[in-house]
Amino acid sequence: MKAITRAALLAGFLALTLAPAAGAAPLAAAAEAYRQHLIDDIGAALAGVRTLRERLTADDLAGAKAAWVAARVGWERSEVFTSGFVPDLDQEIDAWPDASHGFHGIEATLFGARGIDARQETDALVAHLADLRAQLAHIDLAPQRLLNGIARLAFEVGGNKADGGESRLSGTSLNDMQSNADGIALAYRVIFAEAVATADPKLAAAAQAAVARLQADVKIADLRHLDADKLRTDSEELVALLQTAAPKIGLDKPTLEEGAR
């Protein structure tokens, strides 16, 4: 009888030791639900860049500019994911400022003084986005890294993006920040909102309100009307709330460092 009891105790101890952290399975399932949103947004960016290539071939500068702007939306919504999971592709696709390739190299050609000959850069951008979309079918969407991505992007929107904008030549820096904020809201809602609400309803309400404030800060008609100080404060508050929430849902506090797990 004692042997059975000791065996049972040992089995119970091992089960507790080897089991996933509380909330790990629901978070993993929520991250999987987010995958399709990423595929859709990167697919939209890819479709936009293919339209851009068609307009360049037709020597349609106005159409090419419009396609470039449209392609940015899906990309910017996905930045919760891109820099932390695929940093090399992120640099090929969206390095800034003063990039000679990717979105911003093409921006300099279309909206700057270099004319319409951006076909080589556009071919490369199509290839990189197609590569990324293919990888999205199987890449491991670790919830910790996605939480890091939300915190990092929120901090960036309130920091260097607010300090002058990312897409200055095209005049669409505000569009970038709006899409970033929408991407943050989407990722938080799909992946983390339910888990935080279960762990701490009061904290969940505060985090959701902080996400909404970030979106409201950039839903303005013109970048000149941006209250940069308020945006910075609101972005930092959101990061702080995410850091408070993380251990309550079985994760480490999110880090702002690139390449963190």
PLM regions: where:
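Bacterial N-terminal signal peptides that target proteins for export
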Residues: 1-9
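Bacterial N-terminal signal peptides
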Residues: 8-19
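Sec/Tat signal peptide C-region and signal peptidase I cleavage site
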Residues: 20-24
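Mature extracytoplasmic or organellar-lumen-exposed domains after removal of signal/transit peptides
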Residues: 25-261
